[in-house]
């Protein structure tokens, strides 16, 4: 469960290493974000010479969560860390590579570019 003030690892090559959630998008009272949900975040840690800098406000999609999420077939999926991929304004990923596995829920939410770049879809 990702909520306001949650810190996530960045799973792409934009130059950001860690982001802090400012807001969960999708309704005025929405509190939690799961896999495939979009958030607004600020960059807390970045590498020098990267595409995004520290203190930039970005949109990102959650690709991994430590909290288990239930799938329609009754199975559960959870990961070892919370991670997100930074997006452009049109919803495409800003980076050109994705690191680590991503959840199958991204395919259902039409993030096909992220699914195709990911090394593994679980």
From Swiss-Prot:
GO terms for biological process: translation. HAMAP family: Ribosomal_uL14. This is Large ribosomal subunit protein uL14. Pfam families: Ribosomal_L14. One of its GO terms (molecular function) is large ribosomal subunit rRNA binding. GO terms for cellular component: cytosolic large ribosomal subunit. Belongs to the universal ribosomal protein uL14 family. Part of the 50S ribosomal subunit. Forms a cluster with proteins L3 and L19. In the 70S ribosome, L14 and L19 interact and together make contacts with the 16S rRNA in bridges B5 and B8. SUPFAM superfamilies: Ribosomal protein L14.
